């Protein structure tokens, strides 16, 4: 399964050409432009949080301490920034952020890439099992 491709397909189904889609993930993922490659021909505008340092801080905080108020605050701040910049649809594309997925701007629709993958695997297992 290709989690990025499946997640982009889900985002495309929930958006229209010209829409802004925000991605909450590690700055390292942004540098690979992996999501941009899949969105390339979609006429969607992809944006990332501007403060890479805070994104890394949130990831490290979750890795070391789990779901903390500080980590939730950092993620909420990033999500709110994306919404303010026009991203009413956001992808949670970091397994650490999946652990605190309720910490996002409530006015934005969220797609968790880990959930998309889990749903695809479950569907595959059900189909493989047969009637």
Per-region residue spans from a language model:
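Non-catalytic structural scaffold of enzyme domains
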Residues: 1-131
